[in-house]
Amino acid sequence: MTGPSSNNKRVKLWFDAKISAGVVVGGSVIADTGAWADTMTPNNNVGWQLTSNVFKLGDAGSNTQYAQGSAILGGSHGGIGLPVFPTAIETGAIVIALTGSSYTAAAANDLVATWFEVSAMN
């Protein structure tokens, strides 16, 4: 859910996120709302959703993946994003992170994530 403001907002879903001092500093963005400007797509007190699928690509141990995501902003579906090809080390931990910001106003609580789900198959 977004806060009751018309501040510009942005949400990103990261795969193999690199985190330093509590801030995501690297990784692959696998779903992104883009610059969610209220004047283009209303973002005052509306719902949002990011989804992405990540698949193993290539031979075992090649550390190559394929990801594709989409975003829904209020009542507007952003379509399917371009493919992303992460290179996470598959024998270690892979960090998945969700970031949100009110990037022009820096207002706290302008974006709220109410749940986060990861499903895996082998």
Language-model features, listed with the residues they occupy:
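Surface-exposed molecular-recognition determinants
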Residues: 1-122
